[in-house]
Amino acid sequence: SDPNFLRF
């Protein structure tokens, strides 16, 4: 549920 984990 964290869009930050898609930031890679």
From Swiss-Prot:
Where does the protein end up? Secreted
Q: Does the keyword Metal-binding apply?
A: no
GO CC, one annotated term = extracellular region
- Entry keyword set: Amidation, Neuropeptide, Secreted
Record function comment: Myoactive.
Question: According to the UniProt entry, which residues carry Phenylalanine amide?
Answer: F8
Q: Which GO terms describe its biological process?
A: neuropeptide signaling pathway
Protein known as: FMRFamide-like neuropeptide PF1
Q: Which family does it belong to?
A: Belongs to the FARP (FMRFamide related peptide) family.
Tissue expression, as annotated, is: Nerve cords and paired groups of cells located caudally to the base of the pharynx.
